Amino acid sequence: GIVAIARLVKVYELSATLKGVDTEEAVSDSDTKFNAKLMMPFLLAFFAFCIYLVYSYKDNLLPESASEHGVEIDRLFNFNLIIIGIVFIAVNILLFYFAFKYYSRKGVKATYFAHSTKLEMIWTIVPALFLAVIIIYGLAVWNKITSPIDPNQAVVMELCAEQFKWTARYGGNDNVLGESNYKLTADLNPLAIDTTDKNSWDDKIVTGEFHLPVNKIVLMYFRSKDVIHSAYMPHFRAQMNCVPGMKTEFHFKPTITTAEMREKTKNPEFDYVLMCNKICGATHWSMQM
């Protein structure tokens, strides 16, 4: 229907052109001036709406980070948000102000120039400098988070993903995980653990819920039995892909207990959650622990 209407309008314009009829509607100075005056009130209304959205949805944001490295992640996020916010505000103010000040009027023509080296340098170098600061800061934070640790100083565990559940495995009394190999997968050995490896004999396997120690480094290994999953623990600001046929790892130090977070959020039913952050199938949404 819309395409047909557009075609009819085009036919009308072509026929009018052939007849020598001017189809352009005359716009008076008073019309353009009126529209220009509306720009500033619209700008204020737009900013007011943005402030309203921030205020309305602030309670849906994540609470403070419950991990040591998460504080750095939040600081980096806020740093980016401040830069983006300044650019967002400045660009919109200039956009609406120029539409208000330089509206079309009779006898006034805009200056056209094809090239300006100075302008090209400004809008290339300035964003590049800001981007360089963000990248360098981000890399510094990432290198700090992923720096090597001594496994002997951490609680070692593994998260195994499959459609559509998680299984956790702890290193047991020796804090060492037994080896695993996908070729060993069987009904009686769903995690494909190498039972000939003595380190696996005291491994603790849990489903439904797992626990992390507070103020102690946790070294997590991740793997998948089927498709790519992504272990996402939003309150700890931690995420790592689970890839079939290989192990990935991530370490962090929890700093806030469940009881403390319940008090901070004033939510007696609060619990930390592990979710899959990759669309892995029909009931991906239910893959939580």
Please place each PLM-identified region on the residue numbering.
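Hydrophobic alpha-helical segments
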Residues: 1-83
